[in-house]
Amino acid sequence: MNFRRDISALNEDIIVEQLLRSHDPDGRWLDSEMLLQEVETILSFVLQNDVSRPLLTENCITTIEVFDSKETLPYAIFRISVQMLCPCTGENEIRKRTMVLFDLLKEYRWDAKAVLVLGVLAATYGGLLLPVHLAICDPVAASIAKLNQLPIERTKFRPWLESLNLLIKAMVDVTKCIIKFEKIPFKQAKLDNNILGETLSNIYLTTYRVVKSALTCMQQIPYFKQTQQAKKSRKTAAELSIESRRAAGELSSLGYQLLNIHTRLNKQVEDCSTQIEEEINQRLRNINIETHQDNQDVLHLLFSLQDDLPLQQYSRQISITEVQDKVTLLLLSKPPVEPLFFLLQQLYDHPSNTNTEQNYEIIWVPIPSSQKWTDEEKEIFDFYSNSLPWISVRQPWLMSSTILNFFKQEWHYKDNEAMLVVIDSNGRFVNMNAMDMVLIWGVKAYPFSVSREDELWKEHGWSINLLLDGIHPTFEGREICIFGSENLDWIDEFVSLARKIQNLGFQLELIYLSNQRRDERAMEESSILFSPTLQQLFWLRLESIERSKLKRIVIEPSKPDRVFEEVRNLLDFDYGKHRGWGIIGNGSTAETVDGEKMTERMRKIVRWGEYAKGLGFTEAIEIAAEKPCELSHTAVVPFEEALTMKVVTCEKCKWPMKRFVAYQ
């Protein structure tokens, strides 16, 4: 018994040596998991007994490519099938042909070798069994089966079909183990050499057995047809029965061998994966304090459990090296989230954008609410990842739970709250959440560090630009009045007064941005700018300003901050207590006025009539807030000089003065 075991081990060592000599990967990459899913779908459908069951999958085969290779997937399948369909007589020829296949597949990784061979098996047996499978309910399929001399009655070859089904399931299961092993990021962590060496040896041998078993299945195609040809054959029923049992037995034997291998290999792969994840988890804890040469180590670690092409931009699959030497913004969010669209506008559609955007990249990392992605969430992700201009994680549902837990526990990611983690070109974490910063300033915030945010707040105070920059064009000198209310009577009065003031010659733009939406047509008829999108972005922007300022107030609680107070008052505005609010300014300035006081002052401006011409709206509102002088005052101005003056104001109260012509 020990002698036999030694001989078997010696043979396995020889096989491994031969396999390694024929293994020369050139960097080409195939989505083995997706292709295996299609293979499993095809074979499980044609091998099932219930014809009425629908095919519960969408066709993804057209999206599968062989990357970094001139060889297309269909051509690779064809090239392999030519060798697999050649007849082999005896075990020795099958072994030799198996090694020929490995020479043919030398440029591919181990998981791709196994999956491509199974792809040939699915294409061949799928084409043979599909007409047989559908013949009961489809006359055309029955005719095709007869023309190809295929047996329509499944009972005649059911034992063989069951054995084939057993073997195919076993091959698929062990191939999943190979794929899982190939996805383990050994570059990011170290594994015990003995454990790794033993597992690698089993991966090689298992791949060999999958290829050899698939080749054996292909060699039994003539038997599959012989039940239909039995009437023309001289073989007796007994002889056919013996051949049937022999063929089924051969497939069953291979299937049980692979099932036993699967149990051992699956445990080994799980152990390797667990050890690597534990070490990666330890590295993640130190990721903020480690020194890096660039951002590649950090990004490879964060997306370590993905394949060589873990990212995508639109439908193009890309590697992490494409964001080297750039500032990287990791956008963590549910798919989708409202700030995504504002972020898109601020970083890509903002009028002030220049070539700065070439120096940074956004990588969207969608995180679902539950541990398992729903079909709806996958569809939403596919739509937005193929529509939005930034990079996204490809197949985020395959991300490691270790990484996701790290985001939630160490980075404090919360559901329904998108966050934007900034990694500079040297791999340093310069801002653990730049979301509010980007929503406020867009590309002006580059390089999106905490220190840059402090600089921006020193440069910007309370102004119309701060409120509207990036969501509505503001020009220095043009006066804007933003107003809001839930009182329809007050809004109508405000709009009526504003139109009268505009008729006096005041250049004034009105923007309605209350929390309550009004009829859009009615607002347009009143010459009022109203946009539900602008309304949504305005309040989203205010919330971002509040959060950004709040972080600084926590650091310096005793220092007064006008911006924070003004924004907080707007967000907490009591529409039941007050009729409305207004903010007036000309770009670099802004003044907030209570709604009741606003209309009261506007009525004064209307009463002034032409005497207010020459004043700006903001200036007129400020003057109207002052009480007029109790005593009458007179200012004598030469006639020619008065012709050039648009308005004359009282030196004491600043109210506009009526004009009279006096003759001396």
Swiss-Prot record:
Lineage of producing organism: Eukaryota, Viridiplantae, Streptophyta, Embryophyta, Tracheophyta
Protein name: Protein SIEVE ELEMENT OCCLUSION C
Organism in which the protein naturally occurs: Arabidopsis thaliana (Mouse-ear cress)
GO BP terms in the entry: phloem development
InterPro entries membership: SEO_C, SEO_N, SEOA
Pfam families: SEO_C (PF14577), SEO_N (PF14576)
Highest taxon in the source lineage: Eukaryota
PANTHER family: PROTEIN SIEVE ELEMENT OCCLUSION B-LIKE, PROTEIN SIEVE ELEMENT OCCLUSION C
